[in-house]
Amino acid sequence: MGQEPPVPIAYRVPPKERGYYEITVAEIKDGYVSDYVLNHVQVGDHFLSSGPAGHFVYNTAFHKKKSLFLAGGSSITPFLSMVRDILYSGEDRDIVLLYGARNLHVAIYHDELTRLSKEFPNFAYQLVLSEAEEGYKGEKGFLDERIIRKYASDFQERTAYISGPNAMHHFCKDTLLKMGLKQKDIRDEVFGSSNDITKEEGWPKEIDGNQIFKLKVGDQVVDAKAGESILVALERAGIRVNVCCRSGECSLCRVKLVLGKVYLANGMLLRLADSKFGYIHSCKSYPNSDLEIEF
């Protein structure tokens, strides 16, 4: 892949499995990495990988014994991992998994999840299609209040976990809160910014996403596209950056903004000290002028 940057991958191996990783790569139009992985990678190719990271898991000490999993699209993967782990280890937990997908063709792992729901009495699974094929007789629509009440009428007794596209994520979380579920009983997986950051509320209208600025770091000056994060600009130039979540939370990729203007995407958890001294998270910061940064 040459100078292709590192990319976060959805792992689906149960936590107790050892010795290998399984990954799921969703095809994205004009994707930076997905096209290469899906169309060019061959059996026997080697990759350098960091270890899995993240905290989107069920916690037996703090979470309720009953779980409500709300999944959208390819974000079914963390739930598949947790479902396998809970069921095959014999844990005393009750799971309801509601999976929203456009159609059957893109509903990955549907057959396995259907089989598991028949084998294990403590696991209920329901697929909901928003653009169902003609003749489909299952549930249609979205993961809304009607669906939740129908398949998890005891939702107040459950810890809810949400993972999916940003729109679905916000919709489901707002729905659960309006239904009376407490914030402490909702766990959600954080994702990076929108594929088109220029459509995010707050983006300066005078800046075109394809506009190219200059980014100075040390003795190097590289191109930085307005619609791509500073992190991606650095990675495209072959400059390695410590990075983990790529969602504006962990701060591992933070840099100091010396000169220039940036757009800070929604969801960046910037510490007060970082804000005071000019540090930003490069994964959620987008150039709006020529820039100079320091590591």
Predicted regions and their residues:
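A short, basic/flexible loop-to-alpha-helix module at the beginning of a structural domain
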Residues: 51-63
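Short helix-loop-beta connector
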Residues: 60-66, 155-156
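A structural signal for isolated positions on well-ordered beta-strands in alpha/beta enzyme cores
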Residues: 22, 48, 68, 94-98, ...
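Conserved S-adenosyl-L-methionine
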Residues: 62-64, 86-95
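Ferredoxin-reductase
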Residues: 1-46, 50, 64-66, 101-103, ...
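Reductase modules of NAD(P)H-dependent flavoproteins
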Residues: 103-295
